[in-house]
């Protein structure tokens, strides 16, 4: 069993999964979505849930630096509700994702020397991995589901 990390954007959802023991997070893919037309890629998430044997979802919560919640927090919470409707037996938790995209950009530029064009293609995957790894490192409540 694994946990799935999700970085919900307005056009894509970055997906990561944990190893079966809950020690590390790995990037999986980016799912295109269209919020305006209510296309959320839930069918693709369902395929990945089955393939990866997902036991819990960890959704990034993009709070503002002053800890207030803006429209992107609402979008992440809405995505959580969609997952809850589709997968009522799989628990959901949220992880503060402040600065994960900034950290992902820094890592891609400084450490991996990735071009800007390629960054746009992988940034959400990397951010989803950072979100899930942070959750695993702090031993969020769903980590016990893996044991």
Curated annotation (Swiss-Prot):
It is found in: Cytoplasm. GO terms for molecular function: nuclease activity. GO terms for biological process: rRNA 5'-end processing. The keyword Nuclease applies. GO terms for cellular component: cytosol. InterPro entries: RNaseH-like_sf, YqgF, YqgF/RNaseH-like_dom, YqgF/RNaseH-like_dom_sf. Its EC number is 3.1.-.-. Pfam families: RuvX. The keyword tRNA-binding does not apply. Keywords: Cytoplasm, Hydrolase, Nuclease, Ribosome biogenesis. Could be a nuclease involved in processing of the 5'-end of pre-16S rRNA. PANTHER family: POLYNUCLEOTIDYL TRANSFERASE, RIBONUCLEASE H-LIKE SUPERFAMILY PROTEIN. Belongs to the YqgF nuclease family. HAMAP family: Nuclease_YqgF. This is Putative pre-16S rRNA nuclease.
